Amino acid sequence: IIHVLRCFDNGNIVHVDGSVDPVRDKEIIDTELQLKDLETVETRIKRVEKLANVGGDKQAKIEYGLLLRYKEALEQGKSARVVELENEEEVAASKNMFLLTTKPVLYVCNVDDTSAKEGNQYVDAVRNAIQGEDAELIIISAQTEADIAELETYEEKQMFLEDMGLEESGCNRLIKAIYSLLNLETFITAGEMEVKAWTYRKGWKAPQCAGVIHTDFEKGFIRAEVIKYE
């Protein structure tokens, strides 16, 4: 879940609640997601309770126990992701529940262009609020990104970023943060006709990566020629 928070003052852009408070905005969305998950959990509990307690279904027992822990956390105003999964069976059961608050979260602090590099007091408040959460935070100025998008050449964009004191665009940093949060990386294949990027999960070995290109490449894997590049 990408959670965009307003972290800038601008009298011409009126906030729906009349003031700028990104922590309040975060908590409102958190509550809405938690209430939706609580509704989902209570519905599933009704469905699996009998199977777990009467039918003796092993999978139902695992799911039922996890659902009760999720319910307790959600009723306390916590997200489901704070519940620690005890084994692989619970990990599998959790994935099948599709709860919103078990998903990884990336907080995007949208600041004015003068705060694009270091952030501001609003960003500091968000950082303090998410301590203890398994979440990422990045700072982006949507106005700066809009200005960059209007430039035509790569050189113009790089010069603009340098003038702003930035090493790369917010879009690039957003993509990298998402990849990191989802435990993903990229490898590149190069040939005479094209260069292409492929996504894989961190920790995969070369045969698994080859399978991303084509399943036959994984089955008949021989070797990979690896080239370092900057």
Enumerate the predicted regions with their spans:
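C-terminal-of-GTPase-core extension/linker across diverse P-loop GTPases
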Residues: 47-230
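Conserved phosphoryl-transfer catalytic core
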Residues: 38-46
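Conserved P-loop NTPase nucleotide-binding/switch module
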Residues: 3-33
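Generic hydrophobic/packing signal
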Residues: 5-9, 33, 45, 49-52, ...
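Amphipathic alpha-helical coiled-coil segments with heptad-repeat character
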Residues: 19, 26, 31, 38, ...
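Glycine-rich phosphate-binding loop used to anchor ATP phosphates in small-molecule kinases
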Residues: 1-5, 85-87
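Alpha-helix boundary/capping and short turn/kink residues
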Residues: 7, 35-38, 57, 116
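Active-site-proximal flexible loops/turns
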Residues: 13, 32, 44, 117, ...
